[in-house]
Amino acid sequence: MARATEIITGAESTNKLGYQCLQHELVDGFFNRINLLVASQAIKDRVARAEKTLDELRDPVKRAMKLWGIGSDAVSRMETECERVCRDPGERKLRRFCDMITSVFNLMRDRGGMRLEVFQVELMRGFFIGIAANQFRDDLFKYKHIILDLLGLATPDIVAFNPFCPSMDTGREINRIFDEYGKNYTLALAPRQCGKTTIMVILLAAMISYLDIEIVVQAQHKTMCETLYDRVELVLHEIQHSPWYPEENRIVTIKGTTETREFIYDPAYKGTTRVHFLSSSPNAARGQIPDFVLIDEAAFVNPASLLSLLPLLAVKNRKQIHISSHIAKSWVTRVETIMGSDGKRAFHVINQRFKCDGHAHLPGMMCPCSAVFCPTHIDLNESIQELINNITPGGCELELTGGDGAGVLKRDVATPFSEELVRQFMTNAVPDLSGVKRVFIAVDPTYANGTQSSFGVCTFAELNNGMFLVVALEEVAIGEMRSILMHFYTTVLMAHVDYILGIINRKDIPIIFLPEQNTFMFDNETLWSHLSGAAERKFGIKLLVYRQFNKSGTTEIGKLVSGNKASMVIKVHNMMEADMLGRVMTVASFGEIVKGLYLHNKHVISKYYRADTVKTITDARDAIANPRDIEDFKKLPPADSAEYIFRYLGGTEVSVAHGDDGIFKAGTELVTRLGCELMNVSLKSVGRTVKVITGGKRYQGGSYSRDDLFSAFLLGTSMMGRPDDATDGLFIVT
């Protein structure tokens, strides 16, 4: 007999009854519907006949008659064919899937009629519908209406739906519900002690009991993982020793440790289920290929751990569920704002609170709209609210009610550079430089020993209309350049001067060196001496330097920003909004290229002295003392000899080739980095002052975050709108 469905490839085809379908009949929706109905009935009739034949062959007398009549080979072939027709893997999977859903309801009934909260019902629906695609694959279309019926989501039309003779409207409604709950990522937010973990433990135990699947469960630390496993094991035992669970389908044995548990069943029932209970660490889940991922208290889990799991969402038919309490300013609060290409929410988000947004400003811990979501075992009263809020203002609304306490907890914090504003600045690109008034090379240097800082540079071109354009950027870790720091800084800054002279093609434009004042004033003077001398020798120009007046009336090189940083940030924000801050189309960067050239020279010198390793000085105090004479030099080991020669020669001469387009690729990357550093900036009110928080110098994921590029950018923009007769400082040659 022909297959239940067929692919129409020509103008004609034959239906299941042998009728030759003409072209006009193939495009007739009513004819196709009747044809599918007949085909569906034909399949059912075929299965019924096969089951009847198998029943006859199981009867000893009838089997003997068949053997006598057609022979043993024919009977064997008949039996095999009938078993093939009746054996539908999808039907067996459906039976187990339905048993899994039913077991959850049976367990709740056995527990005395356990009442689910609204968010628990939504979470359960997202769980079952989300893993259905992994279990049924291409056969899912046949069973969607059955699953929706079991979960209480089916209308009468959905209950009566025939997937082989579908109603278009009902089919669309089924797909709409599946698209809503069946997204590959579900985030469930609910206040403390509402039962997030409780419902997931039950669902995990049911999944382990019925499905062939690999699972990853992640929590903050090992103790939480062990607690989760103990709870799952208890519910698993409760399910498998219930009267409604078949005894022959119980777990045969459990192998492994908490990190990888293998639940082994009789192969005649189902395969092995593996569950990995992993603590939060960046690489704990790498190498795993789970079908289902659960993360408990996701808002508090190490971000690096999330980054090892979230990329798995790109794999089809995988499901992740993250559950968490609310936390102000966390990434979990922004997930529901992510939209798909269809304008709808990209992910399934469940956000249960006891107080809605419309009543958030009113006193009390609940509102008439959302009070129904408060579980009966939680008693909220004003005394508890006052106690918690005495410790942390807004803490009760956040921890117990699920309200957004961010406005209360962080009302003294402002984020001046929003994503939209930064994007506006980055897209404000000017194709060429015309009408340049002067150029500022703003530098955030570091001279300290053992610091994690980088060398930050931001070169601006100021136009006649007052607009500032970013021309070149640097943010280079200086650890490997410690021994030749001044030479390295001078080479990079000279590359900026060379680039500026090339693109404006004029030498009469003032180029001003603008370093940040710090405790190493002598080093700033030394750097200026190196730079001004090199520029005069190579280009025949005299650079200017900014000197700021101090309290005694004398001038010091550079600009002091520590006391004015907040006002400078606000000024930059206003200038960005007014489109007075932009960039050239091709921002350049030379630092990493120059650093690579110096490291190459260092390697060549070390190779000449046959040093096994290249000695890297990250702290000037670790550098070798200068040898007093040639005899002292000869006594040095190869690595120290190479390091001394490298330092003595100033790294030797290096220069960036004018045809190296790598400077623009590096510049584009730094423009993006500058945007990220800008978005990390916040203003916090501390007493009567406003503190600028840049987010730099923090250890994250094995490295320190940086803010040196932002510091140089902020320093340069401080010169915006500065009148020529300003009395804060001077632009002078020496």
UniProtKB/Swiss-Prot annotation:
Family matches, as Pfam families: NAT10_TcmA_helicase
Sequence positions that bind ATP: 190-197
InterPro entries for this protein: NAT10/TcmA_helicase (IPR007807), P-loop_NTPase (IPR027417)
Keyword annotations: ATP-binding, Nucleotide-binding, Viral genome packaging, Viral release from host cell
GO molecular function: ATP binding
Domain of life: Viruses
Protein name: Probable DNA-packaging protein
Organism (species): Ictalurid herpesvirus 1 (strain Auburn)
